[in-house]
């Protein structure tokens, strides 16, 4: 079990460090900034690379919503759910803390949103709570369907990390303007702790929407689509 939890810790660490790091350090870099597309690709690449690296150990969840979805679908024992969540959140917090230290090394640094999520005045595009809730539930549900489908016995072997990574990239392309992309409660928690905004006051929704979406996605796959 320790090996699985370590894999989830380091996998989630890499997701936050690489994905949020790209947003904090590189997205708006003068003239050469990577923008929304670069950040979206970074998140997808973190999952793709670590799924290949440690997916065989823990399943490569790196996300409490994914772990819940796989539990509902019968892919993860219920007794492992909370330990997975703890490892994922700790990995996210560790990565966010190190990113904060690195970013604060620049003159004139201001924590600001620190790649945190939000709705209303914390939404990159000024979207409402209802808009954020709806898009995150839908996107998380489809993310779970992608994961369950690409890792099923019916899917071509060896390609699941690619499908999952590109799926997460697409999710970010759609939702960065709306919420800065939640779908992962651990990622949301890690950066919210260090953001100089009201992100913590909205953190409850960063958990509720992805977890609801995960359950919906698992039910859809298991009841309507799943054949494995």
Curated annotation (Swiss-Prot):
It holds the Pfam family MIP. Disulfide bonds: none annotated. Keywords: Cell inner membrane, Cell membrane, Membrane, Repeat, Transmembrane, Transmembrane helix, Transport. It catalyses: H2O(in) = H2O(out). A motif (NPA 2) lies at residues 184-186. The lineage of its organism: Bacteria, Pseudomonadati, Pseudomonadota, Alphaproteobacteria, Hyphomicrobiales. GO terms for molecular function: water channel activity. The keyword Repeat applies. A motif (NPA 1) lies at residues 63-65. Its main location: membrane. It comes from the Bacteria. Channel that permits osmotically driven movement of water in both directions. It is involved in the osmoregulation and in the maintenance of cell turgor during volume expansion in rapidly growing cells. It mediates rapid entry or exit of water in response to abrupt changes in osmolarity. The record marks 20 as: Involved in tetramerization or stability of the tetramer. Aquaporins contain two tandem repeats each containing three membrane-spanning domains and a pore-forming loop with the signature motif Asn-Pro-Ala (NPA). The chain crosses the membrane at residues 1-21, 23-43, 82-102, 129-149, 154-174, 205-225. Belongs to the MIP/aquaporin (TC 1.A.8) family. It is found in: Cell inner membrane. PROSITE patterns: MIP. GO terms for cellular component: plasma membrane. It comes from Brucella melitensis biotype 1 (strain ATCC 23456 / CCUG 17765 / NCTC 10094 / 16M). Homotetramer. The gene is aqpZ. NCBIfam families: MIP (TIGR00861), PRK05420.1 (NF003838). It is a multi-pass membrane protein. The record marks 43, 172, 181, 187 as: Selectivity filter. This is Aquaporin Z.
């Amino acid at each position: 079990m320790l090996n699985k939890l370590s894999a989830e810790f380091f996998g989630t660490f890499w997701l936050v460090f690489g994905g949020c790091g790209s947003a904090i350090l590189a997205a708006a870099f003068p003239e050469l900034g990577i923008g929304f597309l670069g950040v979206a690709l970074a998140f997808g690449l973190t999952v793709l690379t670590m799924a290949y690296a440690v997916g065989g150990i823990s399943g490569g969840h790196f996300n409490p919503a994914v772990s819940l979805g796989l539990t509902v679908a019968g892919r993860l024992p219920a007794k492992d759910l909370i330990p997975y969540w703890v490892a994922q959140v700790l990995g996210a917090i560790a990565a966010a803390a190190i990113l904060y230290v690195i970013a604060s090394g620049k003159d004139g640094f201001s924590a600001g949103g620190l790649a945190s999520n939000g709705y209303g005045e914390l939404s990159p595009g000024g979207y409402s709570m209802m808009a954020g809730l709806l898009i995150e539930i839908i996107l998380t549900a489809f993310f779970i369907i992608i994961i369950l489908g690409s890792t099923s016995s019916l899917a071509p072997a060896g390609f699941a990390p690619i499908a999952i990574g590109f799926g997460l990239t697409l999710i970010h392309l759609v939702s960065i303007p709306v919420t800065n992309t939640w779908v992962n409660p651990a990622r949301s928690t890690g950066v919210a702790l260090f953001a100089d905004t009201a992100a913590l006051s909205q953190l409850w929704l960063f958990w509720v929407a992805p977890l609801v979406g995960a359950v919906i996605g698992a039910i859809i796959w298991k009841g309507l689509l799943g054949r494995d």
